[in-house]
């Protein structure tokens, strides 16, 4: 089958970018143009010969434009197989003329529902019915019909028509058809996502879950140079999230895959301290290696850095308030890969930009704390709710004879916020709202405790008077006894071990105050 010459075009677009110039050139190539509503007016106002779709259907647009192209003379003209003699005869018998080119983009549903306080009625009116129907009909019959949904493809179509006596190539028609089904799939998912937000979680729950991924950024590589990688916008039942919605890179080379993981880790942790005293978080390989609060950012930085004076080199630092000059000068004394803050005060950017390899990132708004987490495995996708439930001071259950002091409670709460952001098994020592020793990612909780104590001793931090947090219960008393030996005075842990009584007795024997949260924070 030879490539069909484009003689008739149906044009109906919401996004009118480039449509006048495109249709003017189509007209100059001898293409007969039919159009609808606002598009028809735009073309006619520009002096382009275009006829109403009603001249094909013999039926007016009705119901405020809801019904205009849903007609056999439209879809017959799109779906007829030109090489099928029976189709050709039926088309002729019913006064159906072939349509060779469809130029349609859809009502801006996603842009509409993204507006603040959009009404349900406005959202519903922006669900396109006729547009997707025409696109799908044209795309199905891509052997004969060229279908364009993206103004970026106008030039390609014109180029091929000029080079091929008014026809497009089979390869191009197939490529454009693929874009149609990608578009309509994404469009329907956006509608379903919006409607899911209008019903209760129980009503919306289903045995299947759909997500959409649209590439936002190409990464230089993945975790390692031999791995390809990219960052994709994600749309699920909680809406669409993208990097650019929450962050803006102000300086530095492009962000890597590992950078993105570290940014997610750093900002998820700093969110725990939104609105609190000046707080600094230092991240290395997604684990916090230093976290501290103080009366100023510069003091918080020095305290966080003192937890581990080696790991912060090449690390990621997040601040819970605008980065001021004093803190910037202190941080600038070492090389850090990424600095993240809600803003940078006057003069700070000029100072920090002198290091070309450093990335400076503004966090524009708070990250969502609820929603789903997705983890890919070779055998399927694991889905879980985010670990976003909060343990308040009132939720703590004191299980020992000694009650914790107010100062101990403050440190226990500080430690618990950090604990859930560290890879399991986690043991964390905190003193005066500063991490003193971080034991992360060990197969044995006792080993995590030993590492945390060793890290503190390496930088001469005295654990006497500190508190300890464990992301899961102590299965035996040995971990707690090791903490007591280090000088800990209070303990926070989920509880729930069959040996809780044994652990509580050990705490009482060492005059420790211990609280249970009733909530575990494993992080794999």
From Swiss-Prot:
Q: Which GO terms describe its molecular function?
A: IMP cyclohydrolase activity; phosphoribosylaminoimidazolecarboxamide formyltransferase activity
The entry's cellular-component GO terms read: cytosol
Q: Which reaction does it catalyse?
A: (6R)-10-formyltetrahydrofolate + 5-amino-1-(5-phospho-beta-D-ribosyl)imidazole-4-carboxamide = 5-formamido-1-(5-phospho-D-ribosyl)imidazole-4-carboxamide + (6S)-5,6,7,8-tetrahydrofolate; IMP + H2O = 5-formamido-1-(5-phospho-D-ribosyl)imidazole-4-carboxamide
| An example Gene Ontology biological process | 'de novo' IMP biosynthetic process
Report the sequence similarity comment from the record: Belongs to the PurH family.
From which organism does this entry originate? Chlorobium chlorochromatii (strain CaD3)
Q: What is this protein called?
A: Bifunctional purine biosynthesis protein PurH
Q: Gene that codes for this?
A: purH
What EC designation does it have? 2.1.2.3, 3.5.4.10
Q: Which InterPro entries match?
A: AICAR_Tfase_dup_dom_sf (IPR024051), Cytidine_deaminase-like (IPR016193), MGS-like_dom (IPR011607), MGS-like_dom_sf (IPR036914), PurH-like (IPR002695)
